C-alpha cells in the first residue's frame, strides 16, 4: 500500500522518500492555522509547510524578513494540532540560523515546542554546513534554492527568476548538489527556468518541490491564499482554484444586511427560556404576563439587583 493510503499515523520523511521512489508527484501547500490545516489534511495533502510567507499573507508585513521565531512557532503549533497525517515543516525565519548554534537551538524549538517534523532553510552552498549539523543532530531538513525571499535585499530587492545565465545556472546546480550531500531530504526550487529545474531534479536522488519552476520537479508547492483566491494579487506561477475573497465578502455583506433588517438572529439561532422561570426572575405572575403589565421589578430594572451578571465575557 502506498504511504498516501495510510490515515492512521503522521507521515514521516521516510514515507515522503518512498512516495518519491515510487514515482508519485508530491503536493505541498502552505498552512498557517488550525482550521486550514485540518481541511488540507482531510484533503490528503502529504506535506504542509508553515512558511514565513505568513508574514505577508496573514500578518500584513511588507516582507518575510520581519517574521519572528515566536510567530513561526505559534502558527506551526496550530498547524500540527489541526493535522493528523501530513508531515509538517516549519520555515526557519530570517537570521534564526545565522550560526550553527542558532540553527540547532531554533530548529530544536520547532520540533520540541511546536511539534513539527522538519524545518526548511534557505540557501545552497552557503547553508550546507548548517544543514549538515542539523541532520547530524536528528533534525530533518528541507532545503530551498533559487529565489530565496529572506535574501531579497541582497538579491536586488525585486522578485525575479534565478538561474537564467550560464554562471547563475551552474551556481544553482552546485547549490542543489550541496544541499543533497549535506543530508537534506528534499528541497524547494523557486522561480527557476523550467529546463534548469528539470535538469536539477534529474541529477538528484532527493525530491525537488517546485514553485514557479515548471512541471519537471518532483512535486509542487503553492501558497494557500493564492490557491484559494484570498488576496488582491496573484503571482504568475499560481493558479486560483477558488474565489474565497469574493465568497467571504458576499457572506459578510449578507450577514450585515440581515442584522440591519432585524432578521438575524431568527428563531433558529435563538434560545428561549421557560416562561414560568422568567416570571419568577421578573417577580410577576402568569396573569401579569398575559396582561402585559409591568411589575415593580420591571420598573426597578428587570430585577438586575438580584444577581443577573453584567460583566459576562463574550
Model-based region annotation:
Residues 2-242, 246-275, 279-280, 284-314:
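Alpha/beta enzyme core
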Amino acid at each position: 500500500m502506498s504511504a498516501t493510503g495510510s490515515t492512521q499515523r503522521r507521515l514521516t520523511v521516510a514515507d515522503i522518500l518512498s512516495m518519491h521512489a515510487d514515482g508519485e508527484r508530491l503536493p505541498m501547500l502552505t498552512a498557517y492555522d488550525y482550521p486550514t490545516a485540518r481541511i488540507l489534511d482531510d484533503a490528503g495533502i502529504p506535506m504542509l509547510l508553515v512558511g514565513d510567507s505568513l508574514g505577508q499573507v496573514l500578518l500584513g508585513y511588507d516582507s518575510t524578513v520581519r517574521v519572528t521565531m515566536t510567530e513561526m512557532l505559534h502558527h506551526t503549533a496550530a498547524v500540527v494540532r489541526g493535522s493528523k497525517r501530513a508531515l509538517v515543516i516549519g520555515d526557519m525565519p530570517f537570521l534564526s540560523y545565522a550560526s550553527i548554534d542558532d540553527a540547532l537551538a531554533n530548529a530544536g524549538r520547532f520540533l520540541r515546542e511546536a511539534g513539527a517534523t522538519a524545518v526548511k532553510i534557505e540557501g545552497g552552498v552557503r547553508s550546507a554546513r548548517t544543514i549538515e549539523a542539523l541532520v547530524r543532530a536528528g533534525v530533518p531538513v528541507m532545503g530551498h534554492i533559487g529565489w530565496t525571499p529572506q535574501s531579497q535585499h541582497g538579491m536586488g530587492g525585486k522578485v525575479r527568476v534565478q538561474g537564467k545565465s550560464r554562471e547563475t545556472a551552474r551556481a544553482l546546480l552546485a547549490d542543489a548538489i550541496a544541499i543533497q550531500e549535506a543530508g537534506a531530504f528534499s528541497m524547494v526550487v523557486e522561480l527557476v527556468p523550467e529546463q534548469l529545474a528539470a535538469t536539477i531534479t534529474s541529477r538528484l536522488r532527493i525530491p525537488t518541490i517546485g514553485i514557479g519552476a515548471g512541471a519537471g520537479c518532483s512535486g509542487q508547492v503553492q501558497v494557500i491564499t493564492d490557491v484559494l483566491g484570498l488576496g488582491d494579487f496573484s503571482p504568475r506561477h499560481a493558479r486560483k482554484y477558488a474565489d474565497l475573497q469574493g465568497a467571504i465578502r458576499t457572506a459578510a455583506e449578507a450577514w450585515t444586511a440581515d442584522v440591519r433588517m432585524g432578521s438575524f438572529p431568527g428563531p433558529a439561532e435563538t434560545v428561549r427560556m421557560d416562561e414560568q422561570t422568567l416570571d419568577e426572575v421578573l417577580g410577576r405572575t402568569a396573569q401579569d404576563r398575559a396582561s402585559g403589565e409591568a411589575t415593580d421589578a420591571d420598573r426597578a430594572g428587570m430585577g438586575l439587583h438580584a444577581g443577573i451578571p453584567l460583566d459576562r465575557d463574550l
